[in-house]
UniProtKB/Swiss-Prot annotation:
Protein name: Large ribosomal subunit protein eL37
Pfam families per UniProt: Ribosomal_L37e (PF01907)
PROSITE patterns named among the record's database cross-references: RIBOSOMAL_L37E
InterPro entries, per the entry: Ribosomal_eL37, Ribosomal_eL37/eL43, Ribosomal_eL37_CS, Ribosomal_zn-bd
Name of the gene: rpl37e
Residues binding Zn(2+), per UniProt: C20, C23, C35, C38
Protein family membership: Belongs to the eukaryotic ribosomal protein eL37 family.
GO terms under cellular component: cytosolic large ribosomal subunit
Keywords: Metal-binding, Ribonucleoprotein, Ribosomal protein, RNA-binding, rRNA-binding, Zinc, Zinc-finger
Function: Binds to the 23S rRNA.
CC cofactor: Zn(2+)
Length: 54
């Protein structure tokens, strides 16, 4: 018997995010090919009203 899935240990040693070309933040997801900060490669920059300071 083992605790949990053995495959999950193989996922941990890879990079999930790298530096984004557009915004420069370390938020570009390598697997989904999308930046969680600016939304690259979408043509419009990602911005939400709830994310801005009041």
């Amino acid at each position: 018997m083992s605790n949990g899935t053995a495959v999950m240990g193989k996922i941990n040693n890879k990079k999930t995010h790298i530096t984004c070309r557009r915004c420069g933040h370390h938020t570009y997801n390598v697997r989904t090919k999308r930046c969680s900060h600016c939304g690259f490669p979408a043509p419009r920059i990602r911005s939400y009203k709830w994310a801005k300071a009041k």
